[in-house]
């Protein structure tokens, strides 16, 4: 199965908020050991390279260009491309973006907000997002911490306004919509057949459309379908040929990978061998055809029949 890209919101916020945090032991009553004296950002860096958590962007290089580089250096198969990437990581010629989040090549550029009020709502420490993500007024009162990171590269001057484009799917003019460059009018709860939940309680709401979406609003499915269609059209000009992409996936629960690390040994520091899927994240080569993004979005892929479906270590056939 093709691994899905994953990202945790908490680490997205840590792209800039870590500058205002100190050492664990400074604000928590914890025993003195190598874990409690770490900085949060350093721990996140370790968790990514050891395969505990995902992070995007992955590296300081474009992964499409990275696979081309591997092929230009003699890699002919997917396994050889994986080995090329692995060797670059081991030699530290290829760097993790999480290890230097302030570097310009590691900045996220496009932010889609969907089903959440990320700015001033879901995101904790929103003043830091306003300052560093959007480059706008922030009412920030905190100053940079004197406890600098040890592994994550520290920049004395933090960049502001990392994002080039913020797009919000919304039916309310909340704070995220107010700060977005583009607001796509989304259908509200009773204008679509869907599942919905909130952060107020654990209930899942199965909703049925009472009326059709009003005015220019569209269902989430139709909005993403149009985005996929136009992306495919643009891809015919800029990414007309099939591409090979590199995807790093964390070790997942309910799989063999969750029991591969009995002890915490960091391959990045030479404490053990770097073995994808065991001592570190998995490395997968994925074939992508961006010109067919729309066709794939509206179709049921043939991998369903070949590989089946499943979750949490279970798999079932779909003949």
Question: Where are the language model's segments positioned?
Answer:
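Domain-level signature for respiratory redox metalloenzymes
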Residues: 1-168, 173-319
């Amino acid at each position: 199965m093709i691994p899905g890209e994953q990202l945790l919101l908490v680490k997205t916020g840590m792209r800039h908020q870590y500058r205002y945090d100190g050492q664990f032991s400074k604000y928590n009553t914890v025993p003195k050991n190598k874990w409690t004296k770490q900085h949060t950002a350093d721990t996140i860096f370790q968790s990514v390279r050891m395969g505990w958590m995902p992070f995007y962007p992955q590296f300081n290089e474009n992964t499409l260009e990275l696979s081309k580089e591997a092929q230009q250096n003699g890699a002919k198969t997917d396994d050889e491309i994986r080995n090329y990437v692995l060797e670059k990581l081991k030699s530290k010629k290829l760097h993790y973006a999480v290890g230097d989040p302030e570097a310009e090549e590691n900045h996220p550029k496009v932010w889609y907000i969907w089903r959440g009020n990320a700015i001033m709502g879901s995101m904790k420490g929103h003043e830091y997002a306003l300052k560093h993500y959007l480059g706008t007024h922030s009412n920030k009162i905190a100053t940079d911490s004197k406890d600098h990171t040890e592994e994550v590269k520290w920049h004395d001057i933090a960049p502001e306004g990392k994002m080039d484009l913020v797009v919000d799917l919304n039916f309310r003019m909340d704070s995220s919509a107010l700060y977005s460059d583009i607001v796509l009018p989304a259908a509200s709860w009773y204008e679509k057949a869907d599942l919905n939940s909130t952060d107020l309680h654990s209930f899942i709401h199965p909703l049925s459309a009472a009326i059709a979406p009003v005015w220019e609003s569209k269902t989430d499915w139709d909005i993403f379908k149009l985005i996929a269609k136009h992306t495919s059209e643009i891809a015919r000009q800029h990414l007309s040929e099939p591409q090979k992409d590199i995807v790093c996936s964390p070790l997942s629960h309910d799989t063999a990978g969750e029991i591969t690390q009995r002890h915490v040994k960091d391959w990045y520091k030479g404490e053990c061998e770097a073995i994808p899927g065991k001592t570190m994240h998995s490395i997968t080569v994925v074939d992508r055809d961006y010109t067919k993004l729309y066709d794939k979005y509206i179709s049921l892929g043939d991998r369903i029949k070949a590989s089946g479906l499943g979750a949490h270590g279970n798999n079932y056939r779909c003949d």
